[in-house]
Amino acid sequence: MQYTFAHVDQPLNLLIMLVLGHFLVDFPLQGDKMAVEKCPGKDVTLNWRWWLTAHAATHGFMVAVLTGVPFLGLAEMLVHGLIDFGKCRFGYKLIVDQALHWSCKMIWVACVTVMH
């Protein structure tokens, strides 16, 4: 089953939507508790794996909805989780974290462009 939206025929529009969606999901929808407790050793109310999986899954859902390609949503979930785990483990700066996430969005746009 192929899902399509009006904006996916224009790669720049899709990239803009993915970046806007990223900001929505990564900041206001994440919440302070999840931002802290998704890191190993900082979990208090729930095991960090659940927090990280839930956060990555919201990103995956957003990518699947905006691209119309569920497999890209799964890829986003996995890669986003790995990037955030790396940030927790190695403590790299927010700008590095965000640059990695935005790079993924560019890759997803390239994939959609090739697929269409």
Residue positions per predicted region:
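Transit-peptide-like, low-complexity N-terminal presequences
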Residues: 1-8
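Alpha-helical phosphate/pyrophosphate-handling elements in metalloenzyme active cores
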Residues: 2, 55-65
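Interhelical loop and helix-boundary elements at the membrane-water interface
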Residues: 8, 18-59, 77, 81-112, ...
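Structural signature of hydrophobic alpha-helical transmembrane segments
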Residues: 10-20, 67-74
